[in-house]
Amino acid sequence: MLAAAAPALAGWSSSVDAGSLAVSSATLAAPTGVAAAQGACTPRQRTSLTVVVTWAATSSPGATGYTVLRGTRATGPFTAEGTVSGISTTSWTDATGQLRFTTTYYYVVESTVQSWTSQNSATASVTTPASRTCA
């Protein structure tokens, strides 16, 4: 007999009937209002580049966190760069050390619950500065 486990999210259910699998599911909502901005610049010179990504919390009550993805094209592909635990935390700082000067980066955020993810949020973009000098 085949069994399926569904996340503990309102509206998600699974059942097994005579060897067949019937699953009904709710949609895990992506976060909204995603924005990306250059991180703080220390006085006189940047020692590294950072980007701060913010969003509004998902409307899905069973979500447990977020995955932040980054790409160099608005249409992707996007690579997971960070995770955030808890749905009330709605920001993440990209301090991965992989950012380059004078480059536009695109970010999307997904809501998560267990191994399930929502669709991507709308895309936010930011262009890193041209030099190490702080404005």
Regions found by a protein language model. Give the residues of each.
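Recognizes extended acidic, P/S/T-rich segments that occur
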Residues: 65-100
